[in-house]
Structure formats: C-alpha cells, structure tokens
Amino acid sequence: MQTIITLPIKARARAHRFYLDALGLEPVGEPGKDGIPEPLQFKLGTGVSLMLIPRTGFGWVLGDQPAAKAGLSECLLQCSCDEDGEVDEIFERAEKAGATMVLRPEKKSWGYTGSFTDPDGHLWVVTNAEPW
C-alpha cells in the first residue's frame, strides 16, 4: 500500500523550493512545463510520499469541502534525526528557505526537539528522540 500525505499550499513554486531546500526531499515524477512535477510530490520513504495541492483545488479533492484555514491543523508532521546536529542543520536550512520558527531546538525530557511552520503554515517537528 502507498501512503500519501496531502497538504494544501498557496504557491507551487514556493512550496517546491521550500521542500527541496529545507528538508532535502526528493521530488517524484517528471517536471512539467514550469519545471515542477505535476502532481507535486516528494518521496518521504518506502511507500510514503508527500503531495502538495494548491489550496484552490484542495476543496475539490475533499468532495467540495472547504479546506481548513492556513495555520490550523490537528496534525504534526515530524522528522526524526539520529543526532542533535542534524536537527540544527534542518532548522538552519528551513529558516533560510522561509520557515517560521515556532520553537527553536532545545533539550527536552524526550530528546532534542524544535518546531517550525512551512510557508503555508503546516507545523513540522524535528527531533532527535531518546531511545524508548
């Protein structure tokens, strides 16, 4: 089974550039006329991808239901790293690529963690978690 996480976006080019630069994700598919794959997808892992759909078409995908307002979410998107330095590197790249810092990386009881929002307001958590 293929799992696809789908998020609404405001601008394809901006979202494409952010996920390339901030998280170093690998695009899926052949580039279209604008140089960006259509649909805009990134490989997250074996059998898992991230699809980014313009907000104007997102409601259609939902069966003509309105998409939540930007910045409202009941979902955390999380990256798990092997070292604290890797967390810091992702935060540096994300900030340069246009992320808004929510919580800069710091040591918590469960590990080294921080969070940011992408340019469309989706919340990402990056963690080097303590072993369970």
Where are these regions (language model features)?
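Short catalytic micro-motifs in class I SAM-dependent methyltransferases
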Residues: I4, L23, V125
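Hydrophobic pocket/interface hotspot
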Residues: A15, Y19, V87, A94
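Vicinal oxygen chelate
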Residues: Q2-K10, L40-L44, G63-W132
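A short, polar/proline- and glycine-enriched secondary-structure boundary/capping micro-motif
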Residues: V61-D64, A99
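Core segments of cupin and vicinal oxygen chelate
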Residues: L7-F58
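Short, basic, helix/turn surface patches
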Residues: R55-W60, N128-W132
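A residue-level signal for beta-strand positions that form part of recognition/binding surfaces
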Residues: S49, E74, L123
